[in-house]
Amino acid sequence: MIEIENIEKKLKDTVGSDNWKKLSSDFVKAKKVYVIGNGGLYFTAAHGATDCTRLIPGKLVVSFDSCGYMTSCANDHGYENLFIRWLETSGDIDIVEDCMVIGLSCSGNSKNITRALSWAKSSGYATGMISGVQSKRLEKDINEVVLNCKYFHTCEILTLILFYQLVHEAGHTCPTIIEEIKRKDSWVLGKKK
């Protein structure tokens, strides 16, 4: 059986940490949150952003989903600047004080993530990183939530669970599967609830 490193204990330890409380507080205050990640955490970012936006009215949580922009930007500016360029472009219309950038990195050292968080911090965004292990590259004044994971899959699974914890800490709930089926059935039948 696959080892998931006592994920429930890791979740409790993480949610009880001061760094998590800071990240959660910044998340709750923000009206718009950018989530960035690579590899498996790229998809975790997309999944978490989608569900946070869907489950928290009045909050926009976005991840980077444009492959065309990604290849163009990486070609023109270098992969290490990919997320900085996206934030610069998107940030032109943001009220920075209402925004947050959350970086996801299993190693804590993804150059494009740490560079983007440094740029965001210096531009006035609230920032935070969720990492599998302590970063050796992240600037010290950026809040880092360290999951202390041995495996990539544990880090990715726990990070996704933490997005649902953010939904909860923002004062909302995640519907059960049965509740969601009933809600969708009522829409199909024209009985909006």
Regions found by a protein language model. Give the residues of each.
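Generic alpha-helical secondary structure signal
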Residues: 2-5, 18-21, 77, 81, ...
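Serine/threonine-rich low-complexity intrinsically disordered regions
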Residues: 2-6, 16-19, 139, 174, ...
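Hydrophobic packing residues in well-ordered alpha-helices of helical domains and bundles
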Residues: 4, 20-23, 45, 159
